[in-house]
From Swiss-Prot:
Modified residues (N6-succinyllysine): 192, 697
One GO CC term, this protein: cell surface
Cofactor note: Binds 1 zinc ion per subunit.
Mutation effect (residue 899 to C): Increases catalytic rate towards INS and amyloid
Organism: Homo sapiens (Human)
E.C. designation(s): 3.4.24.56
PTMs per UniProt: The N-terminus is blocked.
Record protein name field: Insulin-degrading enzyme
Active-site residue list: 111
Family recorded in the similarity comment: Belongs to the peptidase M16 family.
Function: Plays a role in the cellular breakdown of insulin, APP peptides, IAPP peptides, natriuretic peptides, glucagon, bradykinin, kallidin, and other peptides, and thereby plays a role in intercellular peptide signaling. Substrate binding induces important conformation changes, making it possible to bind and degrade larger substrates, such as insulin. Contributes to the regulation of peptide hormone signaling cascades and regulation of blood glucose homeostasis via its role in the degradation of insulin, glucagon and IAPP.
Length: 1019
């Protein structure tokens, strides 16, 4: 695929570098809407410039205005009278590349500290508490060149939130006691990443360039860089934070985006009032004209040992910064071709040889002044032995592009696809939208900020050739990641401990690559037949319903249909669940269902890639009840793709070579689960404990050896022999078209796979284990990879119902911010601290998830201590404060989906849970508004208090790698810290030694009754 953003290579990294999503200039008039509103400066000295002509999509109903304040802050204002949440973001064009050389992670630490009190609002959790009380949330991230802060809040409270937010940039406190505690949060954040291959590889790439270049810095920081070493060197880190903020948090390096219901004039006045006081220190914008990879860092090979059993090949070329060429985007053009996955592509040829499974190619962001061009593949066992040949094929393909020369029709196709994507893009969620825009305001003229990432304008063959000229063997860096290098390395990266070996690539290999000839197997892509041409929005039908309607109900299928009446874009979402009792009957069948669908997707890839480029994608996966298929995107060519998928499902022939390769990759993924985070392990074990039927990773691994090609071939017709299909077709389609689509699916399966309906008795769902009153069970396991503990504590409350849902959700709303403030900010238990509802199989409860270096039984005691403080807190709460929580939860629940796929996912959740409560939000919020403080206290005392008569508790304790053992419960005297609230004395829990025995001894809950009477639902 074409490489889109820096984080595709490093999915865990918070590095939202400049996007390369396409490119960018005012589009043809037909595709653009211009702002009508104008606003004069009214001689306001705080405003230097106003941009009233922001180019936007004609489908975009929001109004925009750009500002440049006199102090240099760039601003984009968005007025959306329909928004439920308001949002704002501020991006400082400074990041970890500007850290002082002796205090790694200072910019990241500064980001953490700004949340913890300002002169105007000194209370440590004032900002987060205000947001929590008004249905809001906030976050921030630090990357090499950016620190980006953002929040959302109920639309009535934008001004109060923005006032608290603006103080971050005017007068933060950097309180000494907060600093001493928050350094632990940064350290815990780093510790979470230490055994993560994406972070390790990213740091190793930085470490193997020029050590004097800022790119080589360690950006996250940890306790050693932010406390221990500065203390040894006599450096006062609080003074350094003040100095850093004072030096770099200058208005000329800031960009702000604000979205609200207010008019553009009101938003203008608000931003001017709050942000024109930020001081302009005229800080020069950091630029990095020298590339971190110089002559001595090229023609090098790095052999790297990963944590997980993965095999990857990374081929990297240094290239100049292409940002200024955004109107022609030569990197996009080359990424489109090198990363193509259709017939005749580089991936197609490498896959046919059995060497690779996936390929990503394209430009990757560096910083102002430098970029990279990458070609990354994941290797098969065979591919690991043919790295030299794989890279030769890459250079053969690059040679093909040189020989053919830049093709204007390819550029035109990219331009058309991007123009369609821009015109019909989904409405964004406010928080993500403001954060993204604040980040890109630094790079484009105000008028082009919405179009720049999409619209291409100039075909520049000279620039394409310039970039192509950089993709030569003498410029290459190669990294191979494989467990096979264990014990054969001689170097260790400083911060993550990654083992690697560096070798110069021999001259004869470079020469061989330089002499790469043309390979007849390579072809440029053909014209894309999936580009939509019909964008007609169908008129609403007379019998259109506000919620999905059941328009077909037979032994073979249930079809739910909803014509879109909100978004009016030429898109649809088609969701299908194929129920089969064979899919999960035992671990062997579960493995076979998984492999069947992985092989099917693998064989469809060349065909479906063109559809994906044209905005039409599909998802296919095995589930505990059968198979799930969704097709999303432009409705014009949707039935063509769907028909192809169903035909392929019903007539699939397995390729033996691909079977072996994909089975081996599956075995590695099962083995790699051991390296997941401790808190993820805790969640996994709890699911195994609470669900009636769930196969473990070990059971699946054991059964995988029994999956042979003949066995899998025999399984597919068995799986398809009897099915029940439940579907939701939602979007720009008619009822008649929906019935036709469903008929096509059924007819195809009947014709090719002779599918018959399941019996109704075969459609029963799995149920949840019912814990006894006053029961407390503990299950312990160790994580062999990470040196942190993880815990999930689950208080099972009851079956889902309108009343039970609202008791639980309101309690979670009330404790959410205090939980984070107490357990993470004050007690510093760890970076990951979460509380909220857990729901599965119609049963629910309250859960706490924590990852920490502290032992699980200590975490357990702190959660119990916290719950006791919450009882008093709720009892002492004023009626006004209680009503604020009800209002905040109501706003969250009634927050409208922003796009078709989000609304569809909501309805689909009701269908697959078989609850069918499509109007859930309105009915539950109506009930919520009747609740009193006494109701919540009663709920707490009955279900959650230590001595509650209906308390049902399970705790999963995941021990850190180096912990030999740990008691399940312990006493922790408070005298070591007078600020800690008293933990209650806990009874001895029942330790679960064997999951099966545990489940065998307990009853199961019944299933929740459907909300719909099916006889009445039929139209």
């Amino acid at each position: 695929m074409r490489y889109r953003l820096a984080w595709l290579l490093h999915p865990a990294l918070p590095s939202t570098f400049r996007s390369v999503l396409g490119a960018r200039l005012p589009p043809p008039e037909r595709l653009c809407g211009f702002q009508k509103k104008t606003y004069s400066k009214m001689n306001n000295p705080a405003i230097k410039r106003i941009g009233n002509h922001i180019t936007k999509s004609p489908e975009d109903k929001r109004e925009y205005r750009g500002l440049e304040l006199a102090n240099g802050i760039k601003v984009l204002l968005i007025s959306d009278p329909t928004t439920d949440k308001s949002s704002a973001a501020l991006d400082v064009h400074i990041g970890s590349l500007s850290d002082p050389p002796n205090i790694a992670g200072l910019s990241h630490f500064c980001e953490h500290m700004l949340f913890l009190g300002t002169k105007k609002y000194p209370k440590e959790n004032e900002y987060s508490q205000f947001l929590s009380e008004h249905a809001g949330s906030s976050n921030a991230f630090t990357s090499g060149e950016h620190t980006n802060y953002y929040f959302d809040v109920s639309h009535e409270h934008l001004e109060g939130a923005l006032d608290r937010f603006a103080q971050f940039f005017l007068c933060p406190l950097f309180d000494e006691s907060c600093k001493d505690r928050e350094v632990n949060a940064v350290d815990s954040e780093h510790e979470k990443n230490v055994m993560n291959d994406a972070w390790r590889l990213f740091q190793l790439e930085k470490a193997t360039g020029n050590p004097k270049h800022p790119f080589s810095k360690f950006g996250t920081g940890n306790k050693y860089t932010l406390e221990t070493r500065p203390n040894q060197e006599g450096i006062d880190v609080r003074q350094e934070l003040l100095k850093f903020h004072s030096a770099y948090y200058s208005s000329n390096l800031m960009a702000v985006c604000v979205l609200g219901r207010e008019s553009l004039d009101d938003l203008t006045n608000l931003v001017v009032k709050l942000f024109s006081e930020v001081e302009n220190k005229n800080v020069p914008l950091p630029e990095f004209p020298e590339h971190p990879f110089q002559e001595e860092h090229l023609k090098q090979l790095y052999k790297i040992v990963p944590i997980k059993d993965i095999r990857n090949l990374y081929v990297t070329f240094p290239i100049p910064d292409l940002q200024k060429y955004y109107k022609s985007n030569p990197g996009h053009y080359l990424g489109h071709l090198i990363g193509h996955e259709g017939p005749g592509s580089l991936l197609s040829e490498l896959k046919s040889k059995g060497w690779v499974n996936t390929l990503v190619g394209g430009q990757k962001e560096g910083a102002r002044g430098f970029m990279f061009f990458i070609i990354n593949v994941d290797l098969t066992e065979e591919g690991l032995l043919h790295v030299e040949d794989i890279i030769l094929h890459m250079f053969q393909y690059i040679q093909k592009l040189r020989a053919e020369g830049p093709q204007e029709w390819v550029f035109q196709e990219c331009k058309d696809l991007n123009a369609v994507a821009f015109r019909f893009k989904d409405k964004e969620r406010p928080r993500g939208y403001t954060s993204k825009i604040a980040g890109i305001l630094h790079y484009y003229p105000l008028e082009e900020v919405l179009t720049a990432e999409y619209l291409l304008e100039e075909f520049r063959p000279d620039l394409i050739e310039m970039v192509l000229d950089k993709l030569r063997p003498e410029n290459v860096r190669v990294a191979i990641v494989s467990k096979s290098f264990e014990g054969k390395t001689d170097r260790t990266e400083e911060w993550y401990g990654t083992q690697y070996k560096q070798e110069a690539i021999p001259d004869e290999v470079i020469k061989k690559w330089q002499n790469a000839d043309l390979n007849g197997k390579f072809k440029l892509p053909t014209k894309n037949e999936f580009i939509p041409t019909n964008f007609e929005i169908l008129p609403l039908e007379k019998e259109a319903t506000p919620y999905p309607a059941l328009i077909k109900d037979t032994a073979m299928s249930k079809l739910w249909f909803k014509q879109d009446d909100k978004f009016f874009l030429p898109k649809a979402c088609l969701n299908f669940e194929f129920f089969s009792p064979f899919a999960y009957v035992d671990p062997l069948h579960c493995n076979m269902a998984y492999l069947y669908l992985e092989l099917l997707k693998d064989s469809l890839n060349e065909y479906a890639y063109a559809a994906e480029l044209a905005g039409l994608s599909y998802d296919l996966q095995n589930t505990i009840y059968g198979m799930y298929l969704s097709v999303k995107g432009y409705n014009d060519k949707q039935p063509i793709l769907l028909k192809k998928i169903i035909e392929k499902m019903a007539t699939f022939e397995i390729d033996e070579k691909r079977f072996e390769i994909i089975k081996e990759a599956y075995m590695r993924s099962l083995n790699n689960f051991r390296a997941e985070q401790p808190h993820q392990h805790a969640m996994y074990y709890l699911r195994l404990l609470m669900t009636e039927v769930a196969w473990t990773k070990d059971e699946l691994k054991e059964a995988l050896d029994d999956v042979t090609l003949p066995r899998l071939k025999a399984f597919i017709p068995q799986l398809l022999s009897r099915l029940h299909i439940e579907a939701l077709l939602h979007g720009n389609i008619t009822k008649q078209a929906a019935l036709g689509i469903m008929q096509m699916v059924e007819d195809t399966l009947i014709e090719h796979a002779h599918t018959k309906p399941l019996l109704p008795s075969q459609l029963v769902r799995y149920r949840e284990v019912q814990l006894p009153d006053r029961g407390w069970f503990v299950y312990q396991q160790r994580n062999e990879v990470h040196n942190n503990c993880g815990i999930e504590i689950y208080y099972q409350t009851d079956m889902q119902s309108t009343s039970e849902n609202m008791f639980l959700e309101l309690f979670c709303q009330i404790i959410s911010e205090p939980c984070f403030n107490t357990l993470r900010t004050k007690e510093q238990l760890g970076y990951i601290v979460f509380s909220g509802p857990r729901r599965a199989n119609g049963i629910q409860g309250l859960r706490f998830i924590i990852q920490s270096e502290k032992p699980p039984h200590y975490l357990e005691s702190r959660v119990e201590a916290f719950l006791i403080t919450m009882e008093k807190s709720i009892e002492d709460m004023t009626e006004e404060a209680f009503q604020k929580h009800i209002q905040a939860l109501a706003i969250r629940r009634l927050d409208k989906p922003k796009k078709l796929s989000a609304e569809c996912a909501k309805y689909w959740g009701e269908i697959i849970s078989q609850q069918y409560n499509f109007d859930r939000d309105n009915t539950e919020v109506a009930y919520l508004k009747t609740l009193t403080k006494e109701d919540i206290i009663k709920f707490y005392k009955e279900m959650l208090a230590v001595d509650a008569p209906r308390r049902h508790k399970v705790s999963v304790h995941v021990l850190a790698r180096e912990m030999d053992s740990c008691p399940v419960v312990g006493e922790f005297p408070c005298q070591n810290d007078i600020n800690l609230s008293q933990a209650p004395a806990l009874p001895q829990p029942e330790v679960i030694q064997n999951m099966t025995e545990f489940k065998r001894g307990l009853p199961l809950f019944p299933l929740v009754k459907p909300h719909i009477n099916f006889m009445a639902a039929k139209l």
